[in-house]
Amino acid sequence: MIKSLVELLLLGQSYIISAIFWINLYMNKNHSFIGSNVALITPMFADGAVDYEALNLLIDFHIDSGTSSIVSVGTTGESATVGVKEHLKIINHTVKYAAKRIPIIAGTGANSTSEAIELTQEAKNLGADACLLVTPYYNKPTQEGLFQHFKLIAESVNIDQILYNVPGRTAVDMSVDITARLAEIPNIIGIKDATGDLSVIEQLVVKCPENFLLLTGDDATAVDFLIAGGHGGISVTANVVPKELQKVYLSAIAGNIELAKNLNSKLESFHKNLFLEANPIPVKWALHKMGKCEKGIRLPLLELSNEFKSIIENDLKEINLLWKLSIM
């Protein structure tokens, strides 16, 4: 094992980390998605129309902040309330504006296998770097049905694909064994696990290939997920504090556990409060208060309830103060 230390200039901060970590990172063909990937909101005007100028500013914000990649039109991007044409228009705009300055992961999951194939093929045609595919929701497929669903998508469209298991939204929980079988398919490169169950990551580390990306989708348990062997996350919190969260994630991945936990302690209440109501309601309000987007959100989702607005606003003030006082 290489024991020498290297100094990495990361987002304007000097970090001393193990050289072996960075060597292993760049040997992983999927290294572009290691660290903090943002589950980007879709900014909207009050009438629900997409605000593409605000979207441009958000893309620049994440490029400047060192975010690993952007997920376009996932759950946080309100994929459930955009039509197919608009869905693809948002992906197209994001890919073109990003212009290879940051990788773009397109949300292309559906509970119809044929629709998921169509969306994934279109996303590839538009130039997305990878696709995020949620487990089919509402129709509750069997475990073998899940395997056949993702297998056919992978065989039909030659683009890197990331599985997405979020049983709290889909009413189906993909087993570790099915994930491990799917991990053997070359263009299925990873999974976003949003179960919040740390026993899952412990099993995935053992059963999946070493270069299979293990990404958390649960901000509240992210640091422990990374310490257990995860490679990064697709984050809601990263919408608001991308630079800070990237520091947390890379510290944890590199094995600097004390630093990661110390940094994350400043964000713990915020992670939880961003789910006071259904995502993306609170995070959109937070970004609105930061001046980064209008208040627009689409029915059946509504603007954040008045009783929670002050909580989010206080979180923003506290995070800003705590990070300014940090010695990092």
Describe the function of each predicted region.
Residues 48, 62, 94, 123, ...:
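Conserved, mostly hydrophobic/aromatic
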Residues 26-53:
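N-terminal amphipathic alpha-helix/helix-capping segment at the start of soluble metabolic enzymes
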Residues 30-34, 52-163, 167-170:
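Active-site beta->alpha loop and helix N-cap motifs at the rims of alpha/beta catalytic domains
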Residues 171-268:
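Catalytic alpha/beta core domains of metabolic enzymes, predominantly
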Residues 13-15, 26:
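Low-complexity, intrinsically disordered or signal/transmembrane-proximal segments
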Residues 35-41, 65-67, 76, 227, ...:
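C-terminal alpha-helical cap/extension of soluble enzyme domains
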Residues 4, 8, 14:
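Cationic, low-complexity basic patches in intrinsically disordered or flexible, solvent-exposed regions
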